[in-house]
From Swiss-Prot:
Keywords tagged on the record: Cell membrane, Cell wall biogenesis/degradation, Glycoprotein, Membrane, Transmembrane, Transmembrane helix
Organism of provenance: Zea mays (Maize)
The protein's name: Casparian strip membrane protein 1
Membrane-crossing segments per the record: 28-48, 76-96, 116-136, 163-183
Compartments where found: Cell membrane
One of the protein's GO biological processes: cell wall organization
Function recorded in the entry: Regulates membrane-cell wall junctions and localized cell wall deposition. Required for establishment of the Casparian strip membrane domain (CSD) and the subsequent formation of Casparian strips, a cell wall modification of the root endodermis that determines an apoplastic barrier between the intraorganismal apoplasm and the extraorganismal apoplasm and prevents lateral diffusion.
Pfam families tied to this protein: CASP_dom
UniProt topological domain (Extracellular) ranges: 49-75, 137-162
Keyword Cell membrane annotated: yes
Subunit structure and binding partners: Homodimer and heterodimers.
Length: 187
């Protein structure tokens, strides 16, 4: 059967240039997500670290003061966000190298491990701070802890706002891990 041809699916491989374009796009998105996470962690650490409020009590000589450093959980929050921000800043050059050399495998694997470690650091910091913020707003009747946000309202508003940047950075780190996994799987 000289003239017969086989009918069915044919496989066409994508041109090599489009694969590089996708890898470069993933690397650019990686860099953008790192910048967003840096902004979130830096803003959270600075805002929490500068949070305090003083209330006068009967006279101007007796005052009640609320600071982030009064609660070790909020101090851990500031330290964790600062460490993650420093790491993300130091990882920017490596992310830029991935844009230039999209085939870099071991450096991307290193970023996956370190990104996972930073996610493991920022998650308990943000979660513990969220628990303290909840207690500050609602209190706990069974433990006889009163809600302090009725008196220290600007303090509570500020520490509540700090959580947004930290939880946003958590989401960015998860997306960075997914992007790195996609980039490594394409090799």
């Amino acid at each position: 059967m000289k003239g017969s041809s086989e009918h069915g699916e044919t496989s066409k491989q994508a041109p090599l240039g489009s694969s590089r374009g996708v890898s470069k796009g993933v690397s650019v998105l990686d860099l953008i997500l790192r910048f967003i996470a840096i902004i979130g962690t830096l803003a959270s650490a600075i805002a929490m670290g500068t949070t305090n409020e003083t209330l006068p009590f009967f006279t101007q000589f007796i005052r009640f003061k609320a600071q982030y450093s009064d609660l070790p959980t909020l101090t851990f929050f500031v330290v964790a966000n600062s460490i993650v921000c420093a790491y993300l800043t130091l990882s920017l050059p490596l992310s830029i190298v991935h844009i230039i050399r999209s085939r870099a495998k071991y450096s991307r694997l290193l970023l996956v491990v370190l990104d996972a470690a930073m996610l493991a650091l920022v998650t308990p910091g943000a979660s513990a701070a969220a628990a303290i913020v909840y207690l500050a707003h609602k209190g706990n009747v069974r433990a006889n802890w009163l809600a302090i946000c009725q008196q220290f309202d600007s303090f509570c508003e500020r520490i509540s706002g700090c959580l947004i940047g930290s939880f946003g950075a958590m989401v960015m780190l998860v997306l960075l891990l997914l992007l790195s996994a996609i980039a490594l799987a394409r090799r």
